[in-house]
């Protein structure tokens, strides 16, 4: 999964959420929280979402990047603007 999703790039960390756009947008009407940057337009999801965390391993370099893949669930925080 990680290598296919990161073709053409070799970032140290990539995180991919496995939710529909509608489900992510719905978080904007859930629990309001303070953002890490101090702003007040962040919202936390009521339930956990499925995600995949991809972390570059060792000294692998582009174009042969290698990643450790971890699948998990956690609640997310999103910054919302306007109605989204």
From Swiss-Prot:
Catalysed conversion reaction: an [RNA] containing cytidine + H2O = an [RNA]-3'-cytidine-3'-phosphate + a 5'-hydroxy-ribonucleotide-3'-[RNA]; an [RNA] containing uridine + H2O = an [RNA]-3'-uridine-3'-phosphate + a 5'-hydroxy-ribonucleotide-3'-[RNA]
Signal peptide start and end residues: none
GO CC terms: extracellular region
SMART domains in alphabetical order: RNAse_Pc (SM00092)
Keyword line: Disulfide bond, Endonuclease, Hydrolase, Lyase, Nuclease, Secreted
MF GO annotations: lyase activity; nucleic acid binding; ribonuclease A activity
Annotated GO biological process: defense response to Gram-positive bacterium
Subcellular location as annotated: Secreted
Pfam families: RnaseA
Annotated disulfide bonds: 10-65, 28-80, 35-42
Enzyme Commission designation: 4.6.1.18
Residues given in the record as substrate binding sites: 11-15, 36, 55
Presence of the UniProt keyword Metal-binding in the record: no
Membership in a protein family: Belongs to the pancreatic ribonuclease family.
Subunit field text: Homodimer; disulfide-linked.
Protein name as catalogued: Seminal ribonuclease
Taxonomic source organism: Giraffa camelopardalis (Giraffe)
The organism's taxonomic lineage, starting at the top: Eukaryota, Metazoa, Chordata, Craniata, Vertebrata
Gene field: SRN
């Amino acid at each position: 999964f990680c290598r296919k999703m990161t073709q053409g790039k070799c970032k140290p960390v990539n995180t991919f959420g496995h939710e529909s756009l509608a489900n992510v947008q719905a978080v904007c009407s859930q629990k309001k929280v303070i953002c890490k940057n101090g702003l007040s337009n962040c919202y936390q999801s009521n339930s956990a979402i499925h995600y995949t965390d991809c972390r570059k391993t060792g000294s692998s370099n582009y174009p042969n990047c290698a990643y450790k893949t971890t699948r998990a669930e956690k609640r997310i925080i999103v910054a919302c603007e306007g109605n989204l």
